Amino acid sequence: MSYYIAPRFLDKLAVHITKNFLNLPGVRVPLILGIHGRKGEGKTFQCELAFEKMGVEVTLISGGELESPDAGDPARLIRLRYRETAELIKVRGKMCVLMINDLDAGAGRFDEGTQYTVNTQLVNATLMNIADNPTDVQLPGSYDSTPLRRVPIIVTGNDFSTLYAPLIRDGRMEKFYWEPHRDEKVGIVGGIFAEDGLSQRDVEKLVDSFPNQSIDFFSALRSRIYDEQIRDFIHQVGYENVSLRVVNSLEGPPAFKKPDFTLSHLIESANFMVAEQKRIETSQLVDEYNRLNRGRSYQPASPVAEIATSQPSPNGVNQPQSASPHISLETQEQIRQILAQGHKITFEHVDNRRFRTGSWQSCGTIHVDAESDAISTLESCLAEYRGEYVRLVGIDPKAKRRVVETIIQRPNGTN
């Protein structure tokens, strides 16, 4: 099957890899290329196609390997794979790269529900150290004075804002946001259906019918078209015999004729897939479960502005007071707007020294999704960390990314 490589993607990858193998006098080349973007847009697959076209060998690390029960193992793994790749360049005499898939999933911090471990710190520190000293990468407990070959590092992820800020600065990591435009998407989808007799016009209509869907959606659509034939095959041999027929049969694997890949059939199947997506989006069961776990009923909270507390005054007369006297109206309005959009809220603090490195820490332990909880949590945070920076963070629970970061208190106590 002839898959399509987007020229823009290929150029970016080829330039970064080649530049790291050249000796450019007086030029400091970033070692890491960070490819980020929406889920399912083919970042990893486009990398694989580009590597194959360029004849580049790849050493892979998964984001799931960046955590371990033993502190230091993931950092050691990165150093070991880097040294192995440098040795491959030397032995085979060809370009080789180290690729880390889903770096943000393994080393990022999405919210206070994501634990920040020793391994997370060590992974970030190790990548920073390698980016600064690419020819001097040592294993813990040993030292080799022989300089290594420089190994370009390619990392992929969805949201690099969750990573440690010094790691992604321009001198260490070059960023490339991958969101294929229509022509690129038509080319990629055309490659997916290249063997199925779909015309260029049909591919364009299919893409235009589902403009908000990722590349992975169309790949899954092609797989779904085979479901009808597989269902007929299962009915033909029987549920009780399908295991022996497929796995342990002298007849060989079953053969299937080419399914119906007409545009109308594709759009019909795609609509079923979109309907399943919408059911998940509208169910919001996780919100209900979280509310039950916190002992709250599944009902929207009343606006804070309508809540008043009565405290006895010195003369014995009860006077109503605002629920949040020292939180500005602008901050309260921003909280309402974030929650109205279906987002979650959390608060973070940092002292003056750690502010320069971006080492923020959470003020609470849960997502806040009700205005009354947000106000009370913020009041507690401001009171407890009076001499520090405090910021409000809005989180999109569907995309698992931050949409708002606003500093609402500074060390001098101003809001």
UniProtKB/Swiss-Prot annotation:
Coiled coil: none
Keyword annotations of the record: ATP-binding, Nucleotide-binding
PANTHER family listed in its UniProt record: PTHR32429, RIBULOSE BISPHOSPHATE CARBOXYLASE_OXYGENASE ACTIVASE, CHLOROPLASTIC
Protein name according to UniProt: Ribulose bisphosphate carboxylase/oxygenase activase
Its job: Activation of RuBisCO (ribulose-1,5-bisohosphate carboxylase/oxygenase; EC 4.1.1.39) involves the ATP-dependent carboxylation of the epsilon-amino group of lysine leading to a carbamate structure.
Keyword set includes ATP-binding: yes
Binding positions (ATP): G37, R38, K39, G40, E41, G42, K43, T44
Domain of life: Bacteria
Homology family: Belongs to the RuBisCO activase family.
GO MF, one example: ATP binding
Keyword Transmembrane: no
Inducing stimuli: Transcribed in light but much less in the dark in both normal air and 1% CO(2); the nitrogen source has no effect on transcription. Constitutively expressed when grown on fructose. Transcribed separately from rbcL-rbcX-rbcS.
InterPro entries xrefs: ATPase_AAA_core, P-loop_NTPase, RCA-like, RuBisCO_activase_AAA_helical, RuBisCO_ssu_dom, RuBisCO_ssu_sf
